[in-house]
Amino acid sequence: VTGVQTCALPIWYPKASRYIRQLAETCHASIVLTSSWRLHRSLETLQLLFSLHGLDRYLVDVTMDTGNKAEEIQMYLWGYPEIKRYVVIDDLDMERSFKDHFVQVRDKYFNEDNLKEAVCILRKE
């Protein structure tokens, strides 16, 4: 349709949103997004999308795009050396890159077991 702009919204699983919010609240954590969702959207637009799920106040930044997710996260961490406690959550296996800081989502969404694992990682000193 001429003059109509459409925007494909990613699928959100309500339980996953609740578990991510619980992780952020329990561990006083922030979200830095490295998903492909960030590639054509500003941080402000992403925060608006996250606001639909009560997560906007936790989304604080996005990584730059290098085409390599693990590299993007490493570069972000190098740029913020004050970040000591972090967890990388992804469906891709990045355990080799992030060892004791990684939770792999094997189901369709971040679930309760993932939440427990992420909380344990963030509470380690």
What are the roles of these predicted feature ranges?
Residues 27-46:
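Substrate-recognition element of Asp-dependent hydrolases with the DxDx(T/V) motif
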Residues 10-14, 18:
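Nucleic-acid-processing active sites and adjacent nucleic-acid-binding tracks
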Residues 17-20, 43, 47:
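A general structural signal for well-ordered alpha-helical packing
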Residues 3, 34-38, 76-77, 86:
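Tryptophan-centric aromatic hotspots in well-structured domains and transmembrane helices
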Residues 8, 36, 90-92:
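Short loop/turn segments at strand-loop or loop-helix junctions that form parts
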Residues 17-27, 74-82:
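Short, basic/hydrophobic alpha-helical segments
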